[in-house]
Curated annotation (Swiss-Prot):
Family classification: Belongs to the universal ribosomal protein uL18 family.
Function as written in the Swiss-Prot or TrEMBL entry: This is one of the proteins that bind and probably mediate the attachment of the 5S RNA into the large ribosomal subunit, where it forms part of the central protuberance.
GO molecular function: 5S rRNA binding; structural constituent of ribosome
SUPFAM superfamilies assigned: Translational machinery components
Listed name of the protein: Large ribosomal subunit protein uL18
HAMAP family with a match to the protein in the record: Ribosomal_uL18_B
InterPro entries: Ribosomal_uL18_bac-type, Ribosomal_uL18_bac/euk
GO CC annotation, single: cytosolic large ribosomal subunit
Gene that encodes the chain: rplR
Length: 119
């Protein structure tokens, strides 16, 4: 049990360190944050000043019917980019939420960049 608590503390410390470095998302450049569960992948774009979610996307959405793998997460990035372009948002702050920048996280960020979003 002690190892689990130490790992949780390290994760919280890592998240805080990343958030301190990237700053807050504002209306001109909102923050996109990632969450991975064992089964699903979630991303949401947040304006931290207002405290409002501007756009979100996840593999749990029935109309998308995607799984949690790199190719589907890239499609998820393209869907989010389209939703952001509809709202005239072209610049984001990328918050990897303590996850390593590889695999699903890197694929998602790459898909956003390829779709024309400045991350």
């Amino acid at each position: 049990m002690k190892k689990v608590k130490e790992a949780e503390k390290k994760n919280i410390k890592r998240k805080k360190r990343i958030r301190d470095r990237i700053g807050f998302g504002v209306a001109e450049r909102p923050r996109v944050t990632i969450f991975k569960s064992n089964k699903y992948f979630y991303a949401q774009v947040i304006d931290d000043i207002v405290g409002r979610t501007l756009a979100s996307v996840s593999t749990i959405e029935k109309e998308l019917s995607l799984n949690k793998n790199i190719s589907d997460v890239k499609k998820l990035g393209e869907v989010l980019a389209k939703r952001l372009k509809d709202k005239n948002i072209s610049k984001l702050i990328f918050d990897r939420n303590g996850y390593k920048y590889h695999g699903l996280i890197a694929g998602f960020a790459t898909a956003l960049r390829e779709a024309g979003i400045d991350v």
